[in-house]
Amino acid sequence: MNNYETVFILTPVLSDAQMKEAVDKFTGLLKQEGAVIVNEENWGLRKLAYPIQKKSTGFYQLVEFQANPDVIAKLETNFRRDERVIRFLTFRQDKFAAEYAAKRRSLKAKTEEVKEA
């Protein structure tokens, strides 16, 4: 199993429920195919660097997971078929990227603990 990270952008016209349903669809697909989801982050509504499909904003979602390489083809096929996804990028993390991601997650958890206290 390899470590992967995927970021996808959903169209900004979705309601919160529709956005959550779309994210659940893709994470459910990963779990169904035997992937282990390591981290999931909702980056919220952000401005795009350039217009895509005449839209200047989008809902960003990050998912880090461990899976076999054949799962990626199925995931990206579903991204292409879903009209709610306007862009996506999936890449395999090498050992350095995986270490950096783990460090970033632990640092984020520590800052959230400080905010709660």
Curated annotation (Swiss-Prot):
One of its GO terms (molecular function) is structural constituent of ribosome. It holds the Pfam family Ribosomal_S6. One of its GO terms (biological process) is translation. It comes from the Bacteria. Keywords: Ribonucleoprotein, Ribosomal protein, RNA-binding, rRNA-binding. GO terms for cellular component: cytoplasm; ribonucleoprotein complex; ribosome. CDD domains: bS6. HAMAP family: Ribosomal_bS6. Belongs to the bacterial ribosomal protein bS6 family. Binds together with bS18 to 16S ribosomal RNA. This is Small ribosomal subunit protein bS6. The lineage of its organism: Bacteria, Pseudomonadati, Bacteroidota, Bacteroidia, Bacteroidales.
